[in-house]
């Protein structure tokens, strides 16, 4: 009798478990499981920037207990899938204040023997507006990594670079890493990854900064991409490929290299990797 042939999925799962299990490096667990049939139409017709504010309703009406329930459900789902380390952004801003992060810490205490949990503060309201800045400063003391969204302050005030300064100053003062959403919109006019590299070196944060998404990198010319990889190497910058933001990209007539939603890791790894 022939031995049972495992599926490719099973093979990959087993091999990853042998090496210590999956790592989910980027999530927003505080807002998980909040989509409803009534909201689908609104979200379907809205772009990513609009969704940054559409979630205000959920944030405003969620209690610590509501957030705690969603964190627990998210964590248990990760554990069931073989995830051993889970990094999630947590909203801390004028809308939800500190309710989500209080719930996050409560959940981490419950699951501390089952999974490694790390938190970064999500700054959907930016860090320039005074009340948003207040909650950024409060939240920074309650997380493991500083999180940021410079494009919010670029969109609202034209001050995206200043937002990067604030994020990196805070991370450096606290001695922790900084995870920053960059280049999400599949647009060759976006150069946030390069800007973040420059700011990382300026602030002496080499090796402690992570870019998230990087979708627009692939929309640039090959010459630009390889110059960027050299900057990333100098900044010792890491990237988290998170292609889901692509789903919000509208049809456009810009001419650009043909590419998919993934950060161009096939090019990036040999050019940026610090491993021998």
Swiss-Prot record:
Keywords per UniProt: Signal
**PANTHER family the record matches:** CYTOSINE DEAMINASE
Range of residues in the leader sequence? 1-29
Tagged with keyword Acetylation: no
Report the source organism.
Haemophilus influenzae (strain ATCC 51907 / DSM 11121 / KW20 / Rd)
Q: Would you tell me the protein name for this molecule?
A: Uncharacterized protein HI_0842
Q: What is the lineage of its organism?
A: Bacteria, Pseudomonadati, Pseudomonadota, Gammaproteobacteria, Pasteurellales
SUPFAM superfamilies xrefs: Metallo-dependent hydrolases (SSF51556)
Annotated family: Belongs to the metallo-dependent hydrolases superfamily.
